[in-house]
Structures are given as C-alpha cells and as structure tokens.
Amino acid sequence: IEPGTASPEAGRAAAEALHAAVRDLRDEQLDALVTAPIDKESIQSDDFRYTGHTEFLAAELGGEPLMMMCSDLLRMGLVTIHIPVTEISHDLTRQKIVTRLEQLRSSLKADFGIVEPRIAVLALNPHAGDGGLLGSEEEHIIRPAVNEAYEKGILAFGPFAADGFFASGHYRDYDAVLAMYH
C-alpha cells in the first residue's frame, strides 16, 4: 500500500481497520473512535457496501449518526450525509434538524465541556432563501426546527446564509455550526 494512493489493497485495509475498530468498541477496548477520510470507491466490496464509514458505523453499532467535523477553530455537525445534492431538500425534515441539534448539543457538553453551547444553524439556499424567492426550506423546515429546539432549551440560532456566515467570521460567535449537507 502506498500512502495517499487509492487502490483495492488500500480499500481492503481501510475496511479491515473499520471492522477491527467496531470489534474494539464493542469489547470496550476503546472509549472513542476518530476517523479519517476514506476512498469510497476503493473500499467497496462484498463486505462493505456503504457510502461512507459514518453509515457503516451506524449499521454496525446502531443509533442515529451525527457526522461532525472539528478543527481548532470550528466544530460543525451535519444534518444530511452522503446523499446527492438533488436529494437534500427531500431528506430535510424539521424532526431530523431538531434531532441533530440535540445530538450536537449533547456532544458539545459531554465531549468538549461546554456548559451551555451556542449553535448556529445554516440555511440550505443562497441568501437563506431570500424570503422564499430562492427556496422555501428555510421558512417551512429550518426556522421551525430552530424555534422548536430553542423552546427545548437548546441555544440554537438561525438560519444563517452559509456563504456570508463564514466570510464574515460569525462562526467565531458560536460553539458549533449545524450545516444542512456534507
């Protein structure tokens, strides 16, 4: 295996590593699992038919997965994972967004020690839909989900237009960001 080069051998090694990690998690040999990117084409086999390791881990370990990406400057959770862009608006529901906000809040408290995390929620459409001119998901799905989460005690704010949110540096005002897609 050559590092950084996709190959069937590298895919098999990645799948074996993921299977071993699941065994170790089940045997309580691990407290946490951090994954790195995989080459989704190389890893496909009769034993691995998932669009990513997030889906594999959910199938093997059960539960509803929250994909989260972290750096020193940013923590980001994702509502939808590994689906075509054309399917995102059909996959978004108020309940799914509320669930992801609950999961993200729980992780921020348990894993990062943030007592009352503030979460920014990004819009799906450009300019946060511009009042329905560029899409209705913000008004019919995302904003009601943010309001419901807030009523449950989650400090969720938005939806914010994704393009301007990062360019303006507003992400620094929050402990995490919830985006609609990966």
Give each language-model segment a name.
Residues 45-72, 150:
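Short, acidic/small-residue loops that bind anionic groups at enzyme active sites
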Residues 69-99:
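Ligand-binding beta-strand-loop-alpha-helix segment within the catalytic cores
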Residues 1-52, 95-180:
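Contiguous, glycine/small-aliphatic-enriched amphipathic segments in soluble metabolic enzymes
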